Regions:
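Conserved tyrosine-mediated DNA breakage-rejoining catalytic core shared by Y-recombinases
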Residues: 176, 185-224
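Basic/aromatic-enriched alpha-helical hairpins
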Residues: 22-97
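C-terminal secondary-structure termini that scaffold catalytic or DNA-interacting sites
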Residues: 315-339
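C-terminal catalytic core of tyrosine-transesterase DNA break-rejoin enzymes
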Residues: 171, 175, 181-182, 268-295, ...
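Basic, Lys/Arg- and aromatic-enriched nucleic-acid-binding interface segment
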Residues: 105, 125-180
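C-terminal catalytic core of Y-nucleophile DNA break-rejoin enzymes
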Residues: 139, 205-251
Length: 339
């Protein structure tokens, strides 16, 4: 009995050593009191931390994905293995697997989240590997559709019913800016009438922000035109999984001769870009999309070449109407404050 207890204590001590933590008497006492598991690896800890967290399921799924990639790189990972050199090696592994810079950055952020959890009791703070490691990220390009491409999608002939359904749902979100997750949760209760006009009210799944959309004022009520072709929003919003929807969208892009890589989220980028192209204030676009920061909206928006030409022509017309120097007797010095 005593021998088994000594082995148990030695196991706890070994577990602390693997985590890079000196096994002090107080730590051993605390571990015995809490009946801590012996020799818990980082991989086991991370899986348990994810499963028992109160994070959203989508966040948990992302963390589990990174954990699976980490397992492929090095299985049975211990806490003491988590060093700056390990992070560099993992980054190189991801590069060699053909991952883009921003995909690598996403995995490294997920790993950092798990390491931050481990620091709370499973790793020594001095062993924190992300202290010197900098996560590299590139400014991403947000794909969007221009009006001509939207027109092609609106007019393309689609015989397959499921593909037609996906196309209608995609176009609905091009004209409302909804995320896939928000669109799929819509019910008839989300639609209300104000002064006889239909508005869409919902709370974002991702952010919890309440969003109100006057559908009659967005893109000549095109979203309402699509909605009216279905018995109710429940029929339109009943989409297959995101990956299947994206597969159908790639087929549709091919039918229309659109070379861009279309995913469902392109509809949101398209909405933001076209609203700004129409001259809608970016702060209004922010509210319509439900962004908590206008900086996020600025990232989504793109300036079309036609917008630049339009704005410059407008400025040119204004200059013709206004005489910049109506009084020829004025000199340059007259514009200088000599105080």
């Amino acid at each position: 009995m005593l021998y088994e207890y000594i082995l148990y204590l030695q196991g706890i001590e070994l577990g602390y050593w693997k985590r890079g933590i000196p096994a002090t008497l107080s730590l051993l006492k605390d571990a015995v009191k809490k009946k801590s598991a012996v020799n818990v690896s980082f991989s086991i800890f991370a899986k348990s931390a994810i499963d028992n967290s109160d994070k959203k399921q989508s966040t948990k799924d992302n963390l589990h994905t990174t954990l699976a990639v980490l397992h492929d790189f090095r299985s049975g990972l211990d806490f003491k293995d988590l060093t700056y050199t390990f992070l560099r090696d993992f980054e190189q592994y991801l590069k060699e697997k053909g991952n883009a810079v921003n995909t690598i950055a996403k995995h490294m952020r997920q790993l950092r989240t798990l390491v931050n959890e481990a620091i709370k009791g499973y790793m020594h703070a001095n062993a924190y590997p992300f202290r010197k490691y900098k996560i590299k990220q590139e400014k991403g390009r947000h794909e969007f559709l221009i009006p001509d491409e939207l027109k092609k999608l609106e007019t393309v002939e689609v015989e397959e019913e499921s593909m037609r359904h996906v196309l209608d749902a995609f176009l609905f979100c091009c004209y409302t800016g909804l995320r896939y997750s928000d669109f799929c949760q819509l019910t008839p209760e989300n639609f209300i009438r104000i002064n006889g006009k239909r508005w869409l009210y919902f709370k974002s799944v991702k952010t919890g922000v309440e969003i109100r959309l006057p559908l009659h004022l967005l893109f000549e009520s095109r979203a309402l035109g699509i909605l009216d072709r279905y018995p109710d929003i429940g029929s339109l919003a009943a989409l297959p999984c995101n990956s299947e929807v994206n597969r159908q969208l790639r087929k549709l892009a091919g039918l229309c001769g659109i070379k861009k890589r279309i995913t469902y989220h392109v509809s949101r980028h398209t909405c933001a870009t076209l609203l700004i192209h129409q001259g809608v204030a970016i702060t209004t676009v922010q509210k319509l999309l439900g962004h908590t920061s206008v900086k996020t909206t600025q990232i989504y928006s793109e300036i079309l070449s036609s917008t630049i030409v339009r704005d410059l022509k407008n400025a040119q017309r204004k200059r013709r109407k206004v005489k910049i120097f109506p009084d020829k007797s004025l000199r340059t010095s007259d514009f200088i404050d000599n105080r």
